């Protein structure tokens, strides 16, 4: 769950994005006389609940403004995997991915036009999050900061950076702590981060799968997680889990884009 002060910004940004796609589709793929259109939003793992909420707001907004119904299909998974799926043919009208680099992959295969990052406010990053630790109630391992994740015997759960955008932010947050602790000594930073990943018990393909491993399968002592994912878990299981905010984290900036080539192929 994102901070309340962020909600209006998120809503406006998503409305702008979906509105843009809706305008393009209005008189093309759905036909002038049809009363329903379809938008496919390919997103990263832990955004299901966010977009379920805002899809409903957008549907009501679009119906009131244009008198047409809109069906928004959601697709979720690890951010890198989702980008590759679009490249391989997944029919995405909109991508809302965890990393700008994942979206940029679509430009390399000409699915996005150059300059896409400047098409929407905030360099096409409508909201931010950060990285936190989710631990079991009472914090039995007394985990307070990144150095605790490197201690012998601590079992860490984090997704795979090869497929998960959130996992990349996790890595960068750990690296940032290493910079704070070891300054410019890159070898010490590398060894520190390596020691954390040496404690990883399970490395799932995406952030939601990692949460499932920690929460439902009861594996690990600490989950490195998106703040919104951790907050949602504590809200659902207040007697089982708690959040630890490390001394150093990172400003994670997910990125959105309209997939130009797919929109044009649909006659827009």
Predicted ranges, named:
Residues 130-139, 252-268:
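A bilobed periplasmic-binding-protein/Venus flytrap-type ligand-binding module shared by bacterial periplasmic
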């Amino acid at each position: 769950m994102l901070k309340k002060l962020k909600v209006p910004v998120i809503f406006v940004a998503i409305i702008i994005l979906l509105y843009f796609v809706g305008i393009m589709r209005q008189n093309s793929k759905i036909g002038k006389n049809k009363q329903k259109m379809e938008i496919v939003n390919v997103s990263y793992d832990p955004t299901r609940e966010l977009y379920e909420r805002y899809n409903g707001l957008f549907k009501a907004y679009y119906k009131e403004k244009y008198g047409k119904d809109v069906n928004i299909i959601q697709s979720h998974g690890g951010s890198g995997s989702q980008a590759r799926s679009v490249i391989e043919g997944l029919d995405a009208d909109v991508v809302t991915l965890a990393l700008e680099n994942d979206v940029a992959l679509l430009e390399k295969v000409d699915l996005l036009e150059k300059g896409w990052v400047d098409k929407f406010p905030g360099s096409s990053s409508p909201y931010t999050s950060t990285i936190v630790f989710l631990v079991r109630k009472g914090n039995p391992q007394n985990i307070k900061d990144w150095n605790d994740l490197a201690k012998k015997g601590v079992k860490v759960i984090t997704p795979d950076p090869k497929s998960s955008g959130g996992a990349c932010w996790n890595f960068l947050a750990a690296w940032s702590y290493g910079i704070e602790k070891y300054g410019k000594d890159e070898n010490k930073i590398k060894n520190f981060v390596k020691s954390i990943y040496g404690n990883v018990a399970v490395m799932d393909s995406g952030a939601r799968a990692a949460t499932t491993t920690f929460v439902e399968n009861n594996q690990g002592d600490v989950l490195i997680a998106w703040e919104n994912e951790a907050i949602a878990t504590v809200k659902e299981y207040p007697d089982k889990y708690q959040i630890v905010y490390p001394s150093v984290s990172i400003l994670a900036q997910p990125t959105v884009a309209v997939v130009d080539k797919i929109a044009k192929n649909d006659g827009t």
